[in-house]
């Protein structure tokens, strides 16, 4: 039985979580006024969003870097369409930092051909699938799946928040010339966090000292974030979103290649065939396992 409509709201072809999405914002997205110094982290769900929010916050806020201020990262870098904390996003002081799962075609019109910056983080979709599967089974506001096979069908059909992964990444990449955008690969960030932070800060035109970069790297490692209440989203999970059970955390593993521990050979090969068809001639590389990186550009094996 398909219960997706109970959990999802479809707006102009894209699925959103029904109870958390701010419809007033969605309906006014076209006319949302973008400032030149706005910065957006845009991802498909379960692709490093919270991690990149933490990095952005650390780059921009000295009080975060030196731990003199104890704001939640979600308050520093709120979601545009999921305004859970009811932030006055239009009147926030500059520079405004936002996170979003929006597809390219729902982005505010004035974000095109604008100085405002977008950091698009993408992750190999097999690990996205596994992370999304566990997350959906943990939170009450998403439809649980009894098996990975069941969730994989929904994921490939786009019956999940964010709709179809292939459409999301292709849409943003194929329209990259309309935006001031930097593409970052999750797996590269896992391999070399310091270099990734320097690349992001250079794109943002933020000149950081060695000490500041060191502080950002320390506080932005996935392992450390899991134990920082302001960064790990566990309080949001327990309060605004809600858990089905007490096992697990918002930040689960963040591992590269975790799909190998969950997908059967048949599921993996079936996913490979779909990936090769959907992503043929797509220029961005993908890393499926850090141990097999040399053979991992476009093959989903």
Swiss-Prot record:
3'-phosphoadenylyl sulfate binds at residues 46-51, 123, 131, 186, 220-225, 252-254. One of its GO terms (molecular function) is amine sulfotransferase activity. It catalyses: a primary amine + 3'-phosphoadenylyl sulfate = a sulfamate + adenosine 3',5'-bisphosphate + 2 H(+). It is found in: Cytoplasm. One of its GO terms (cellular component) is cytoplasm. Expressed in male liver. Pfam families: Sulfotransfer_1. The active site is at 101 (proton acceptor). Its EC number is 2.8.2.3. It is an enzyme of class 2 (transferase). Keywords: Cytoplasm, Transferase. InterPro entries: P-loop_NTPase, Sulfotransferase_dom. Disulfide bonds: none annotated. Sulfotransferase that utilizes 3'-phospho-5'-adenylyl sulfate (PAPS) as sulfonate donor to catalyze the N-sulfonation of amines (PTHP, aniline, 4-chloroaniline, 2-naphthylamine). This is Amine sulfotransferase. It comes from Oryctolagus cuniculus.
């Amino acid at each position: 039985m398909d219960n997706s409509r109970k959990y999802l709201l479809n707006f102009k072809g894209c699925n959103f979580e029904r109870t958390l999405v701010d419809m007033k914002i969605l309906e006014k997205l076209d006319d949302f006024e973008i400032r030149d110094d706005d910065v957006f982290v845009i991802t498909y769900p379960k692709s490093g969003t919270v991690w990149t929010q933490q990095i952005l916050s650390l780059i921009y806020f000295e009080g975060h870097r030196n731990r003199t201020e104890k704001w939640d990262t979600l308050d520093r870098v709120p979601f545009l369409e999921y305004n859970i904390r009811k932030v006055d996003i239009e009147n926030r002081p500059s520079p405004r930092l936002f996170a979003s799962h929006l597809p390219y075609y729902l982005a505010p019109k004035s974000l095109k051909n604008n100085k405002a910056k977008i950091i698009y983080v993408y992750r190999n979709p097999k690990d996205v699938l596994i992370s999304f599967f566990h997350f959906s089974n943990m939170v009450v506001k998403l439809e649980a799946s009894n098996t990975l096979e069941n969730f994989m069908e929904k994921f490939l059909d786009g019956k999940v928040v964010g709709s179809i992964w292939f459409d999301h990444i292709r849409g943003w990449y194929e329209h990259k010339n309309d935006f001031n955008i930097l593409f970052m690969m999750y797996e590269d960030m896992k391999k070399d966090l310091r270099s990734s932070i320097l690349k992001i800060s250079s794109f943002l035109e933020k000149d950081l000292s060695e000490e500041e970069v060191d502080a950002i790297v320390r506080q932005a490692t996935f392992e450390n974030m899991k134990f920082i209440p302001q960064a790990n989203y566990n309080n949001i999970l327990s309060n605004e979103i809600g858990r089905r059970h007490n096992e697990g955390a918002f930040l689960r593993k963040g591992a590269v290649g975790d799909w190998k521990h969950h997908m059967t050979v048949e599921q993996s090969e079936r996913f490979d065939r779909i990936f090769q068809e959907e992503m043929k001639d797509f220029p961005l590389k993908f890393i499926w396992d850090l141990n097999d990186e040399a053979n991992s550009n476009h093959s989903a094996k």
